[in-house]
Amino acid sequence: MLLTLRRWLLGGGTPPATTDVATPSDAAPLTLESTGIDAPLDFAAILSATPDWPVPDWQQVQAWALSAPDPGLQGHAWSLAEKAWLAHMRLALGPHYRLTQHEQSLLLSCLEPNVADATVRFMTKTLARIERVLDGVAQPSPWGSDILIVFQDPETYYRYAARYYADDGEFALSSGMHIHFGCSHFIVQQDDLRLIEPVIAHEMTHGCLAHLAIPAWLNEGLAVNTEQRLRPPVASVHTPHELDGMHRRFWTEALIQEFWSGHSFLRPDEGNLLSYDLARMLTARMALDWERFRDFVLSADLADAGQSAARQSLGVDLGALVCALFDFGPAERWRPDPGRWDHEPERGAFQRTFLTQSPGLHRVPCGETTTCGLK
């Protein structure tokens, strides 16, 4: 991984230096003061008493930051709170974790210093590339930093993720998640460093789409295609022929409504992998004409899974697109039908719940992404 990151980032010139954010045992702040805000924030008082993980009341943090007189000072106050929270997280995780910063990217990990340095630089570079690939669609958050927490082991990773996951039992395995609750951040596992690069690209794409109320399938389709555009996938665990057969056997007129509503992405079975792959294929096909596709993305509404926007901007029926992929039909039985959805639709990068990725997600073959309209 380190060689790849260095090759991406250090190919020309000397990059800006990274910074180790000092976090000795007594450095987790209990009170925050910021320019332009009269009253300090009692940070200790708003930290939750949740076992294991210190999490502040982010609504109170936001109210405090908004009391600053201008947007620049508001963003500065929010950034102070982010670093304060990560300092408390570092203490909770243990002294082997360290906080590293490069421009607006923050990394909390126990990676070796040179790997942490390359990773945080990769985050900064990736953000710029996402903005170019998703021209006119991507919009980085105006507040705060891009935050990545790399957990040393799967047990700690899932124990942390469980705090944000609905108490509904089994959930899909994952390599990384975008936690879009309170302070938006990304989490990944350290076990397989080869997976960190695509996970960073995937999750940072979600962060750049957070301003759009788009359906989950489009959110995930954009993230997977952008990930593969920036970091080509490794060998697939399934051949294209095998995947095609899996799709044809799995999807039914009833299950496709789970896909359109976003709930199939939360399945713990093969439906999770197939949902990401179907989203990838649909997005790649629709993005061939970027100008029209961009209009579609900006107007797509999760309430109808983007059906109306697809007709208006692209002149296509979503049900017909699925039928064309797998020889299903008739199209009207496969298009989004919100009246048949059992739950409220999901946006993707799941708010309050989280993005789930099957172990095979990052090994899905690139397929049409080499010819899709992603720039």
Show which residues each predicted segment covers.
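N-terminal low-structure segments adjacent to metalloprotease catalytic domains
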Residues: 1-100, 326-375
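Intrinsic-disorder-associated interaction segments
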Residues: 32, 36-39, 47-54, 71, ...
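Short, charge-rich amphipathic segments
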Residues: 45-68, 128-130, 158-159, 210-217, ...
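Charge-dense, low-complexity intrinsically disordered segments
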Residues: 72-76, 110-117, 273
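Short hydrophobic/aromatic segments of transmembrane alpha-helices and their interfaces
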Residues: 81, 89-91, 188-189, 206-207, ...
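Juxtacatalytic substrate-recognition/specificity segment
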Residues: 94-215, 305-313
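Acidic/His/Gly-enriched intrinsically disordered linker/tail segments
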Residues: 167-184, 195, 213-366
